[in-house]
Amino acid sequence: MIFDHNDKRPPIVVLCGPTAAGKTALAVRLAGELPVEVVSADSRQVYRHMDIGTAKPTSEELAAVPHHLIDVVDPDENFTAGNFCRLGRQALNDILGRNRLPIVVGGTGLYIQALLHGLIDVPDGDSELRATLLRAEQLHGEGTLYQRLQIVDPVLAKRLPPNDLVRIVRGLEVYELCNRRLSDLQAEHAGQKSPYRVLTLGLTMSREALYERINHRVWRMLEDGLAQEVEFLLKRGYAAECKAMQTIGYRELVQHVLGNLSMDEAVRLIQRDTRRYAKRQLTWFNKVNSIIWLDSFGEFAKVLKLIDSFIYAA
């Protein structure tokens, strides 16, 4: 792997991949060899009190290496990719200021993308305009908004399925609010250079091995007290309907606690939905050409060599 010796941007390492691939364990192991700190890029680990079901680092792992962007907000608070970008970049710059190497560890592709490349500067959503657009779809029939998008932003329309109403509405919303095509804004943003020099490593394994690890981890979470964690959250007043409680592992056990689902069925659904989530993560990351894929186990020496070459490329 050849790195650019003339690139003077500050270096960061990204360690990504599907859930249960062993990212945290590798980051902790790297901390034994390198002066690193971890920035968690996990959309659920930002929530306080949700420890077991989000597979947060253990107390031993947290003691081994400083972690950032964990336990940031309560489960009933809103947290967006924009929030993550702002706080994450602050953490990166703080770590770099201490002459340490930031390692971004996680499987939330959108958060990683926002951190590295920022977010498109578009207006916030307008609930009144959105409601007007949705009423037009109801009044004039299914496909009305998609046809409208084909006229005002044909490039975006070509990318979207005709039934993806959320993104269709967003495209029309942006056009109405700033008189710019969202596809043009996306193209302009894609051409911008990241403020960081990035080495992106992806952990992978065979699908069979990954699914086996996922199934086993679900059982381990239950043994560690995931059902009790869900009961605790409900007793603290976090509603079953709040966004964090509707994520995998929590929504199923909420239904079990409420008597609507047997434990066996809850486990089956958690395992199934986690496998599906891992598949979606891989689909996202497989579109990122810069990722160097590594086997989750047995390539530690290669990881160290890659990071060493990357750091001293500048």
From Swiss-Prot:
Keywords: ATP-binding, Magnesium, Nucleotide-binding, Transferase, tRNA processing. It comes from the Bacteria. The gene is miaA1. It is an enzyme of class 2 (transferase). Its EC number is 2.5.1.75. This is tRNA dimethylallyltransferase 1. Substrate binds at residues 19-24. The keyword ATP-binding applies. GO terms for molecular function: ATP binding; tRNA dimethylallyltransferase activity. The record marks 108, 130 as: Interaction with substrate tRNA. Its cofactor is Mg(2+). Monomer. InterPro entries: Dimethylallyltransferase, IPT, P-loop_NTPase. Residues 42-45 are annotated as: Interaction with substrate tRNA.
